[in-house]
Swiss-Prot record:
A single cellular component GO annotation: cytoplasm
Catalyzed chemical reaction(s): D-ribulose + ATP = D-ribulose 5-phosphate + ADP + H(+)
Record-given protein name: D-ribulokinase YDR109C
Top enzyme class: transferase
InterPro entries (alphabetical): ATPase_NBD, FGGY_C, FGGY_N, FGGY_RbtK-like
Assigned EC number: 2.7.1.47
Species in which this protein is naturally found: Saccharomyces cerevisiae (strain ATCC 204508 / S288c) (Baker's yeast)
Region (Disordered): 1-27
Function as written in the Swiss-Prot or TrEMBL entry: Postulated to function in a metabolite repair mechanism by preventing toxic accumulation of free D-ribulose formed by non-specific phosphatase activities. Alternatively, may play a role in regulating D-ribulose 5-phosphate recycling in the pentose phosphate pathway.
Domain of life: Eukaryota
One GO MF term: D-ribulokinase activity
Family named by the database record: Belongs to the FGGY kinase family.
Record GO biological process: pentose metabolic process
Key words, A-Z: Kinase, Transferase
Length: 715
């Protein structure tokens, strides 16, 4: 299942990032004209659009751009996209934000990419696009979108293998993962064409386009492709030859798994979040409006970028359980206990742990996907934002709501919240929550992902009347918000019982603007809700942080090469602290010194004529060409290695640039604290939670009863 989906509906979300006031953030803005300033770019490719942003070295977002991307659905369950269109949209967004921000492209030191977990298919011979069907004549449609469900039969066959790698994806692969999609292609493509296919997860394809190098991310390979890092279940090379052979994909094992990106025999080939691949190659730098001075971070799935962009936020007041973790300044122990809820059409719940923790109905644990040596768990709700949309737009009073909200100049959700407040007085009830005390709503319209992992679950309502007024719509909306919150509690309770630590929920997405939903989430879970400054742009902001971390990673790796072989009394950690200090205080003298290795920050541009200008800043000249007419040129530099030597090899020493960057740049956040346990609303919600659980068991019981009877007729 997809990590996070773009929501472009009724919430009246603006294109610009939502930020706290300068007084709340207490972060100084860096001038784009500052010759010593450093800037970073983030790129986020969602289901319906590509986005990019520019941030400064204090984490201020200077510019944000978005461009829609198409998806094609010729028949049911077949949903495809174009990698060429996506790359062109990425280039447009990056060039736009650099121009609009006024930042000198020379000062952009790093770029990070996130995207949906969609399967990109290209030729292993020339990296041209290969059609993925159902129209096999249209090579432009070479991406099977994450939400494509064509591979149902193949998924069942894969799950029947019982392979040990399935243990790390909740016991079974989802039809939305990539191995089932690859198996479908084998069954439906001409044999010769399938033999020429090379496969990328979309985030890894974007970093390939940016660098010409085939480095893959642990995030994509581990979370969506059955890859096991070294030591997990005895894995020594990542991919399992036994697994691929058993499911009929032995072709993928040839040449050291080359068509999947290679194995861990090339230790430098798989990187974790924030680790540097290489500088931009010349072609990509021209297309993006950047320079070859800019380094590229390993890619990441979009929901995980939301985790990066939120969990290091500094709450405006103390949060119990988080104070202790503030002492961890050098590694990801400081992130433990911080649950990221990345919300949009659906919601993903991502949590880090030091040890592997298995939770029924929760994907993972995934090692090394966010930080080396740490494990990530991923729970999720398939219907949150889309659930609210569905209930509101299908109600008879929707037209009236739209008209009244427009007249009032507020979002539909804000208008409904005002109606609920009015109803408290009108009906003389204790609180807004009491308005739905006898309405029991269960909202899994499309099945349940977490924590019961039952695709057959469906929605049900107890207590509905024939009232079709706007007041009834408001109460139905309240019950849907309550359902989302109660299900979040259910997911959290299962994770806690399994051994996870959760002290706060770090929210992102447009749902953060819904004050009623935030209050219900806090009171149902009993946890503080932390809302960072970029609620609508947390994901693309997270990718920009990856770019910042990659820049620091590159500098440190370069310095480490210089120090190699020299005697030193310093420990690794001391050298790290001396070299890092803080992002704002890096020595420009050290940064500009090549020390026998050419830094991308110090490259001399060789151009055939005078440099182009954007806002009076120089850009490298490249031959005029469409942004992505062909992929052939990129393939010339394609390699399973980074270059002279691996930038990823041996870099991990118990420290983390990414966590330091997240702490320095994420900024402040506001908090919605839960009411006391003795508060009447908390007591009422506790009672309704028991009813919520009973509705789940009752629905499943009723299905079993009916299925038993139906089954007896066929005997």
């Amino acid at each position: 299942m997809k990590s996070r989906k773009r929501q472009n509906n009724m919430q009246n979300e603006t294109r610009e990032p939502a930020v706290l006031s300068s007084q709340e953030t207490s972060i100084s803005r860096i001038s784009p004209q500052d010759p010593e300033a450093k800037f970073y770019v983030g790129v986020d490719v969602g289901t319906g659009s590509a986005r990019a942003c520019v941030i400064d070295q204090s984490g201020n977002m200077l510019s944000l751009a978005e461009k829609p991307i198409k998806r094609e659905q010729l028949i049911s369950n077949f949903i495809t996209q174009s990698s060429r269109e996506i790359w062109n949209a990425v280039c447009y967004c990056v060039r736009t934000v650099v121009e609009e921000s006024g930042v000198d492209p020379e000062r952009v030191r790093g770029i990070g990419f996130d995207a949906t977990c969609s399967l990109v298919v290209v030729s292993a011979t020339n990296f041209e696009e290969i059609a993925v069907g159902p129209d096999f004549t249209n090579n432009d449609q070479n991406i099977i979108l994450w939400m494509d469900h064509r591979a149902m039969k193949e998924t069942e066959e894969i799950n029947s293998s019982g392979d040990k790698c399935l243990k790390y994806v909740g016991g079974q692969m989802s039809v939305e993962m990539e191995i089932p999609k690859i198996k479908w292609l084998k069954n439906n493509l001409e044999a010769g064409i399938f033999q020429d296919c090379k496969f990328f997860d979309l985030p890894d394809y974007l970093t390939f386009k940016a660098t010409g190098k085939e480095n893959r991310s642990f995030c994509s390979a581990v979370c969506k492709q059955g890859f096991l890092p070294v030591g997990v279940e005895g894995s020594d090379i990542g991919w399992s030859k036994e697994f691929l052979n058993s499911i009929g994909l032995s072709e993928l094992t040839k040449n050291d798994f080359e068509r999947l990106g290679g194995s861990l025999r090339e230790k430098k080939n798989f990187l974790t979040a924030g680790e540097c691949i290489s500088p931009l190659d010349k072609k990509a730098a021209c297309q993006l409006g950047l320079t070859e001075h800019c380094v590229v971070s390993s890619g990441i799935i979009d929901a995980y970028a939301g985790w990066v962009g939120t969990v290091a936020a500094k709450p405006e007041s103390a949060v119990k359980g988080l104070a202790e973790t503030e002492n961890y300044k050098k590694d990801f122990n400081g992130a433990i206990g911080r649950l990221a809820a990345v919300a949009g059409t659906s919601t993903c719940h991502i949590l880090l742990s030091k040890n592997p923790i298995f939770v029924h109905g929760v994907w993972g644990p995934y090692r090394d996907v966010l930080a080396r040596g740490f494990w990530a768990a991923e729970g999720g709700q398939s219907c949150t934002g889309v659930l609210l949309d569905h209930l509101i737009t299908t109600h008879p009073a929707f037209t009236e709501l739209s008209h009244m909200a427009n007249l009032a100049g507020v979002s539909k959700f804000e208008y409904l919240n005002k109606i609920l407040e009015t109803l408290v007085e009108k009906r003389k009830v204790r609180s807004v929550i009491s308005l739905a005390k006898h309405l029991f709503f269960y909202g899994d319209y499309h099945g349940n992902r977490s924590p019961i992992a039952d695709p057959n679950m469906r929605a049900c309502i107890i207590g509905q009347s024939m009232d079709n007024s706007i007041e009834d719509l408001a109460v139905m909306y309240l019950s849907a918000c309550e359902f989302i919150s109660q299900q979040t509690r259910q997911i959290i309770e299962v994770m806690l019982k399994s051994g996870h630590e959760i002290n706060a929920i770090f929210m992102s997405g447009g749902q953060c603007r819904n004050s009623l939903l935030m209050r219900l989430l806090a009171d149902c879970t009993g946890l503080p809700i932390v809302i960072p400054r970029y609620v609508d742009a947390a994901v693309v902001f997270g990718s920009a942080l990856l770019g910042a971390a990659a820049s620091e990673d590159f500098d440190y790796t370069r310095e480490k090469r210089t120090l190699k072989g020299q005697k030193s009394s310093q420990t690794k950690t001391e050298r790290f602290n001396d070299s890092y200090s803080s992002i704002q205080k890096l020595s420009m003298e050290d940064r500009n010194s090549t020390n026998g290795f050419v830094s991308p920050h110090n490259l001399q541009l060789s151009t055939p004529s005078a440099p182009a200008k954007i806002n009076n800043y120089s850009l490298p000249i490249c031959t005029q060409q469409p942004l992505d007419k062909t992929s052939e040129e990129s393939s010339k530099d394609a390699s399973l290695t980074v270059g002279q030597e691996s930038l990823g090899e041996g870099r991990y020493n118990g420290t983390s640039f990414l966590w330091k960057v997240m702490q320095e740049l994420t900024g402040n956040a506001r908090i919605v604290n839960p009411n006391e346990k003795t508060h009447p609303d908390r007591i009422l919600l506790d009672t309704k939670y028991q009813i919520f659980l009973d509705m789940i068991e009752t629905q499943r019981k009723y299905r079993r009863m009916v299925d038993k009877v139906e089954g007896s007729f066929s005997r």
